[in-house]
Design a protein with these regions (language model features):
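Transmembrane alpha-helices of multi-pass inner-membrane enzymes
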Residues: 42, 357-407
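N-terminal signal-anchor transmembrane segment
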Residues: 1-52, 67-75, 363, 377-382
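Hydrophobic transmembrane alpha-helices and their immediate junctions
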Residues: 186, 213-218, 225-232, 324-362
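Alpha-helical transmembrane segments of multi-pass inner-membrane proteins
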Residues: 113-137, 152-157, 162-201, 206-218
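A membrane-periplasm/extracellular boundary helix in multi-pass inner-membrane enzymes
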Residues: 125, 220-262
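Loop-to-helix entry and N-terminal half of a specific, functionally important transmembrane alpha helix
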Residues: 12-22, 318, 345-372, 381-383
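Aromatic-anchored transmembrane helix interface
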Residues: 60-69, 78-102
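Long extracytoplasmic/lumenal interhelical loops at the membrane interface
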Residues: 260-331
Length: 407
């Protein structure tokens, strides 16, 4: 009986469960030129290793990481080696290796829920300023005494984005909470989160929200035999889209979704530029990757006819491509296959409801730059929490000895 009572007790919230939802927020700021989030990663990893003296490497992620570092090692004879970038990536790998068996999904949901209330309050407050008062809004500064690592936090937007630098970043951050609410059938929470995403007018966020609701209706019909509920969800989505489409504040986002065209520079950069550049490269580049440090250097090299893509050297976003385009160009077709295999492994090893978030992450790599950055860490931290099978390598730190064993 006591054992049953203990099993029903809520586990104590760990440092890692607090850190995951906060990471994207704090990583927007700098201390002495260093990302605050990266400093916190070092601290969290150090505390974790001292306490547990072990970590779990997710095999598909580790294989992809090894491929990238070996690739960059050989490429450094042409382009040099970005030490700072790889220190950051090593730290990201380590923090993701602290997830398995140490992060309780229910605790993570509770923490995200509390932080989500505060962040959504910022969205609703800024929505009042933008849509009722007609004011422009800037990022709500969490640390007034620190500088952001982007100049965007000083800019005024006509779109609410709360504590984030842009609306798309807010939507990417809040989507895990929406999926966790779906898994727990917290419908009121789902509605409020969905409304906050609509208010941000992020086309990516609105698209992902629609995917999540459709996934939920499909699961309800297939697994729970709740066909009426599924029809209601689809009906509400159709009515909601029809109602919101008549509001001027959502016209821009809806037009971006309904009128996607490769001739539009914004759409082209986000969706197809990476693919266009990849197919235009020589065969050797397709196999081994471009012989440049990054995509921007490649586009400034003279090898790319920028006018063909309606681009110029003075653009601030020159070199921006989506995550899958970045992977293809830098690491070639073999890197791309390992990247996609990583998602496939997580998909296979996730439960039914967790697959929904994996699906949104897969879609995001076609429209967002989420390749080994803070959003990448947040996405994979959430996905690895729900991995059920045993694709992990246990690394135990002993007395000068590191022992590896398969779980």
């Amino acid at each position: 009986m006591n054992e049953g009572i203990n099993n029903r007790r809520k586990k104590k919230i760990s440092l890692m469960e607090i850190f995951i939802p906060l990471f994207c927020l704090i990583n927007q700021y700098e201390i002495a030129g260093l990302h605050l989030g990266l400093i916190c990663v070092i601290a969290v990893v150090a505390i974790y290793f001292i306490k547990y003296r072990e970590f779990y490497l997710y095999k598909p992620l580790f294989i992809f990481f090894l491929f990238m570092i070996v690739h960059d090692f050989f490429r450094m004879f042409i382009t040099g080696f970005n030490t700072g970038l790889w220190v950051e990536r090593v730290l990201y790998l380590l923090i993701l290796s602290c997830i398995y068996k140490k992060v309780d999904e229910e605790n993570l949901f509770r923490v995200w829920e509390i932080i989500g209330i505060i962040v959504m309050a910022g969205i609703f407050y800024q929505s009042f300023q933008v849509y009722i008062l007609g004011q422009s809004v800037s990022t709500i500064n969490i640390f007034p005494f620190l500088q952001s690592n982007s100049e965007n936090y000083l800019l005024g937007y006509d779109r609410p984005h709360s504590f984030f630098l842009e609306p798309a970043a807010y939507c990417t951050w809040i989507l895990p909470l929406l999926c966790m609410c779906m898994k727990r059938k917290k419908h009121i929470w789902m509605v409020f989160i969905s409304i906050s995403i609509l208010l941000s007018t992020s086309s990516t966020g609105i698209l992902m929200t629609g995917v999540i609701w459709l996934f939920y209706s499909f699961v309800s019909a297939r697994s729970e035999r709740k066909y009426f509920n599924s029809l209601m969800i689809v009906g509400v989505l159709i009515i909601g889209i029809g109602a919101f489409s008549n509001l001027s504040i959502f016209s821009t986002a809806l037009n971006k979704l309904m009128n996607i065209s490769v001739t539009n520079t914004s759409n082209s950069v986000r969706l197809v530029l990476g693919f266009q550049l990849f197919w235009a490269t020589p065969l050797i580049y397709k196999v081994l990757g471009i012989p440049y440090m990054n995509v921007e250097n490649y586009m400034r090299s003279g090898e790319v006819a920028l006018s063909k893509y309606k681009l110029s050297l003075n653009l601030s976003y020159l070199g921006f491509v989506n995550a899958i385009g970045n992977c293809m160009l830098i690491y070639g077709v073999f890197g791309l296959l390992l990247y996609l295999k990583l998602f496939w492994n997580i998909w296979k090893e996730s439960d039914l409801y967790s697959k929904c978030y994996v699906l949104t992450c897969i879609i995001s790599i076609f429209g967002q730059s989420v390749f080994w950055n803070s959003l990448f860490v947040t996405q994979f931290a959430v996905m690895l929490c729900s991995v059920e099978r045993t694709s992990f390598i246990r690394v135990t730190l002993g007395q000068g000895v590191t022992s590896n064993s398969y779980e």
